[in-house]
Amino acid sequence: MIASSKMLLSASILIYFLLNLQSSSAEIADCSFYDTVDISEGQRLSNGSYLYEGLLIPAHLTAKYEFKLLANGDKEQVPSHVRGCVCKLRTCVRFCCPHDHIMDMGECYANMTTEENELLDPMLNVTLDDGSVVQRHYKKELMVQWDLPKPCDDMFYLDNRDIMDEYTLFENGRLLRHYDQVYLDKSEYCLQHRTFGEGNNNSIRIIPHNCLILPSRTGQTVVMITSLICLVLTIAVYLCVKKLMNLEGKCFICYMMCLFFGYLFLLLDLWELSLDFCKAAGFLGYFFVMAAFFWLSIISRHYWKCLTNPCASMNIRSERAFLLYSCFAWAMPLALTGVTYLADNVVNNEEWQPRVGDEGHCWIYTKSWSAMVYFYGPMVLLILFNITMFVLTAKHIIDSKRTLRKIARNEGRIQKLNSDKQNYTQFLLLFTVMGMSWSFEIFSYLVQREKLWVNIFLVADYFNWSQGVIIFVLFILRRKTLVLFKKQIFPKQRAFSRSATQSTIESISQTKRHFNMT
């Protein structure tokens, strides 16, 4: 009898222990962690149910949890707390931070001020299961979930005032991103308040934040690194060959250096290697791209001036001309960079801000019309200037050649004109390459709201990234440059060739004299 009592007591203790163990580690049946809320601060009723923020949660929809879910799906041990499957009872709205926080650049900032609370628009458009759209107060009519893990570290927000950023929030918590027609569940986005500058007035709205869309970077990386290597090789050849270090060659080297650093900062941004100095990298990249355009404009004007007015160009020494060109080609992009920096810090309206370093990209923001003012606008003007210079130069070459043929057969002048024409044609190809690639970039910016055109202009992007390769092929892998490079690298071989030729001539002369004497 005593033994039976002991066995019964042991079994009761074991069952009690197992039940407690199960309840402490159990999850709510048929309820995702993303549909739960920590209700530990709610009122527990005698029947095991909870009263939380005016909502009665039955006991079978509650459980003790000893973990929290991480963004990658792993579980992290935390102190025991009670969670309720509230999203089965009321429409939930998934926040990134507590409801009285503001998010900016992916970071939460605590405790909104009274003034900020007055600016807050608390209403959300929610699409019901029947397709109708209703407005709901985020705090009074919805259940706020704020203790769920952030989807990722680098997030960007959707501002539905922009057609590219339109979205639909559904009653079941899913979000439709209109741009690419992708449905996101609550593990892939979160909502939070954000301050928007609108002229002299600010507003605070609840907007979704989702993870950055990162396409494959392999192709772009390979093309850009190859392009950078080709630019370095081209610069090295020009620095090595003395005959290429004329005024045009020096300007061309400056142009390639600007292109090199512009691409370098783009590559650093692509691989998120410039986040520690994001704004500085964005402004430096902007400066070098603008400087490349100004150096190309210098080259086009130089050829126009030399061919249309050779006397005037001869009066200016090469060193002095290069100094003047340098002052202009470096000062103008520096001034544009200064204006852009000033606007980025002074202008309050986001539509007119350059927003360098915004949304995790260390570059000028290209999704608004402000990019046309600070980036693409100056680019268009410089492209038009270059077109004008090259057209005028081409017209002069054609007219001059026609005139020389009519007047007399001045072989010297015709030969010089042909040489000038070859140099001009070479730089015309350079301008065509750069002008076309950046023109495609501008068109891509203008039609970025159309998904079809975005895919089409992806080819143009690769063309743009490969400019270094094209320059190397056009300017280095041509017979004239290769011959000059060979002579510069192997001067002894040239001397030996001359010596051998002279010895051969002398030998032939001696043989002739020998036969004559005979």
Swiss-Prot record:
| Mode of membrane association | Multi-pass membrane protein
The transmembrane residues are: 221-241, 251-271, 280-300, 322-342, 372-392, 427-447, 456-476
In alphabetical order, the GO MF annotations are: G protein-coupled peptide receptor activity; G protein-coupled receptor activity
- Origin superkingdom: Eukaryota
**Stored Pfam families:** 7tm_2 (PF00002), Methuselah_N (PF06652)
Q: Which PROSITE patterns match?
A: G_PROTEIN_RECEP_F2_4 (PS50261)
Instruction: Kindly list the GO CC terms recorded for this protein.
Output: membrane; plasma membrane
Q: List the disulfide bonds.
A: 31-85, 87-92, 96-190, 97-108, 152-211
Carries keyword Membrane? Answer: yes
User: What are the record keywords, sorted?
Assistant: Cell membrane, Disulfide bond, G-protein coupled receptor, Glycoprotein, Membrane, Receptor, Signal, Transducer, Transmembrane, Transmembrane helix
**Residue ranges of coiled coil:** none
All ranges on the Cytoplasmic side of the membrane: 242-250, 301-321, 393-426, 477-518
Record-given protein name? Probable G-protein coupled receptor Mth-like 2
Q: What organism is listed for this UniProt entry?
A: Drosophila melanogaster
